[in-house]
């Protein structure tokens, strides 16, 4: 979508809630309407910033609807139960998946939690269609990390 601008930012630590909050506030000041948060306590700082500046967030890991119901649209969840079960099953069948193994939407490794009740039905329906299109291979999901972000991770 040419009208969507994606911004990246790194707090530098999973444990720094203040840095996560400041990063989120800066992204919001620069035009971010929705912020996808990762990183433990740094993510808690993003939640605090969303209360202060009134922007929306997508949480990750655990279901963060319980922390700030009106600010959290949804959460991405890693389904460790699926990953562990599949790894044990493959190992018992003599097919231990050594090396790089990616679990994604298509193979049941991740999902979105239930959407916030304030998300309009047409958006919920569109997200379901996008999910189906990913599952059927019509939409290809990839990760392209900008050069500056690669350099940031090397510090």
Give, region by region, the residue ranges found by the protein language model:
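A residue-level marker of the well-folded mature domains of exported/periplasmic proteins
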Residues: 1-155
């Amino acid at each position: 979508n040419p009208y969507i601008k994606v911004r990246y930012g790194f707090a530098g630590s999973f444990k720094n809630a203040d840095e996560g909050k400041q990063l989120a506030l800066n992204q919001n000041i620069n035009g971010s309407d929705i912020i996808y948060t990762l990183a433990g306590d740094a993510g808690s700082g993003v939640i605090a910033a969303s209360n202060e500046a009134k922007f929306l967030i997508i949480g990750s890991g655990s279901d963060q609807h319980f922390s700030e119901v009106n600010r959290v649209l949804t959460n991405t969840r890693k389904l460790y139960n699926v990953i562990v079960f599949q790894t044990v099953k493959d190992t018992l069948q003599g097919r231990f998946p050594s090396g790089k193994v990616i679990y994604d939407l298509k193979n049941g490794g991740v999902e979105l939690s239930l959407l916030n009740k304030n998300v309009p039905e047409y958006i919920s329906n569109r997200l379901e269609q996008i999910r189906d299109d990913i599952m059927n291979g019509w939409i290809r999901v990839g990760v392209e990390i900008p050069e500056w972000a690669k350099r940031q991770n090397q510090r």
